[in-house]
Amino acid sequence: MLGIFFYSYVAIGFGLLLPAIRVQNFLNIGARFTAGYAMLTIYVYVIHVLGRLPLGLTVLSAVMFGTVGFGLALYREKLRHFPAILIHPAILLSGMGVISVLFNGGIDYIPFTIDEFTNWLGISREIHLHGGYEAIRKTVHLPGYTPGWRLLLLLPWQIGGEIEEGLSAAAPFVLHIAVVALIFDIAVFLMRTQGQIKNALAVFLAWIFLLLFLGVEGMGKLWSYTLLVEQPQIYSMVAVLLFIYLSGKITDSENSSRRHAYIYLGLVLAGSYLLKIAAALFIPVIFLFAVVPQISYPFFAESIWRYRLQFCFLTLAPILVMVISWSILNPSTSGLSSPFMTLQLLVNGNFNYSNQEIFNFSDRYFSAIWEYLSGYKIFISIVAAVGAVLILIKRREGALIVWVGWFVLYVLALFWSHLTIFGDYYFQHLNSIQRFLRIPVQLFHTLGLLLLLEYSISILKNQNLIHAMQYLKNTATLVVGGFIILALGSWQIRQVHHSVADTTTRIYQNMDTRILEMKQANEFIKSIQGTKIPTIPNLVILSQPLGHASRAYAKYFARSVNAEGKVYSRFRVNIISSWPNDPQIDYRNLAKIAEFKSKLRSADVIWPIRVDTTLVSMLAELGVSTNCLSFIQENVIVANTNEGKRHFICQKKFAPKD
């Protein structure tokens, strides 16, 4: 609950510091919320990473600026828009999250994927434990990754000083609500301006559209069940397209409001880059969109270059500052950390693959893309495509043109990364195509459904159906619409509650059981270290023939700070696993056999996850009892030294003995 309050309060407060987009019939709530979240991301990067202000002071100053924003808004607006705010998605959906957390008895977060352990939450923990980003800047995993999401996740931890992953779980939820609130405001704006619908009915219909959009999961579940960066990346890039779309709806006569929309767009684009570098692909697309009249008409109705240059500067200057400052701060020679470094291959042509291999890869790559696009939420894709085509028949839509340009560059960049960054394994098997492609597809779904709404409003108006709806607003419209809102709203309440329960216990996800095993191993070791085992014991994980992921899980849970404030690992981690080789290959290798036995003899705690018969025989050689070995995966083996002789004692895993 504290996480929802923190992210929402600071983001909205920052947004209230911005000049309003003063266009008739447009609520600024979603726009301020979304841009404010981007401002928070930028602020933490500039103040903490570049300015090196301590994390605690960074968060405190952010809260103070947010408070100033609320104070200014209260002074300027008094309570004029209070009724509209109370029924706005920014408030009601946030309240839904708060109630779900309270009903659940609180919230925790169990990391779900290996990337969360090694990259996102794992790095956030390291930054927090070391007291700031600068302390780990040169040693962090994938140092070229922009730090925005890693920093956002740890911000609420500074309030109590403790790592509480449950607070971080609210970070994507609040950003999703902010962008959804912007969609709602645009929907109301379209109905009021293009449909000439009265305000109350416009809000009513906008809620129906919004709940339908959430019901089909246009940008995924309202409360994401992971803290991977993909969903926040989607939300922020959708916001980029939404602000381009909104800017195109503001007439040239409202130039000051259009400038303000460009400022919001620039902030969101810069914030998106700090989340993930793929947002940088918008830079050339937006630049070309601005300077080529044949592409941008009618976005710039007047071919005055001053307007085009104004658009370029306000939208691209913030992200260019982020790109340049990050490049200076964190120069990298690793293509995986900094993809731009791979461009030197274009000069020297030093590829690892022959032309024939690249040709064969191209066939597999583009076939995989088509297979995914033709199968992922195909019904929503068709509906969104219908909306896009119907609008394109009427005009060239700027946001859609920018999406197409970005998508082409994105697919080419992913192709290039397979050739230069990902390595031989992913050159043969393709690297998470589904994960990568879900981003542009969900961007298209959101934009296409919004365009379909716009077209539907124009059809209803032309057929005089809107007048009929307003006449019937006290009967059929309210009854049918009320039922839809009640049904879809109840569904969202259920979905959010499931997500809160799931992030806390993983009750609904097919979770890698090794995660909980390593969490329990950490608790087990904490209960006996320094007494029955050394202060810094050696944990050996048996994971045959599984992979090495459990080692990363164990290292994540092992990290802590000692009494002197020094960051350390509570235990050392070793693993016995032949992955990716067949275990039988290692068992025919005498050196490997000797290595495995040496690891077992040196262990203070042996934690079996998956054990084959060969490892069982090795444990028997150490003197582990037959009864223990019969149920080995239910037990943990602890080394004990008595009168100078080392022997191994069997205990139940989840009930350490006193």
Placement of each model-derived feature along the sequence:
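Membrane-embedded, hydrophobic transmembrane alpha-helices
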Residues: M1-I85
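Hydrophobic, aromatic-rich transmembrane alpha-helices
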Residues: V10-A20, Y75, H176-T193, S374-V404
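Membrane-interface alpha helices of multi-pass inner-membrane proteins
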Residues: Y45-H48, A261-I277, I283-L288
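Perimembrane helix-loop-helix junctions
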Residues: A73-E77, F282-L316, I393, E564-R570
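Hydrophobic alpha-helical membrane-interfacial segments at the cytosolic entry of transmembrane helices
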Residues: I87-S100, L267-V268, F300-N330, W403-W406
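Active-site lumenal/periplasmic loops and adjacent helix-entry segments of GT-C-fold
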Residues: I99-V203, K221
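Membrane-lumen/periplasm interface segments of specific transmembrane helices
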Residues: Y109, V292-S296, R306-A388
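Membrane-embedded, lumen/periplasm-facing catalytic core of multi-pass transferases
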Residues: L486-A558, K653
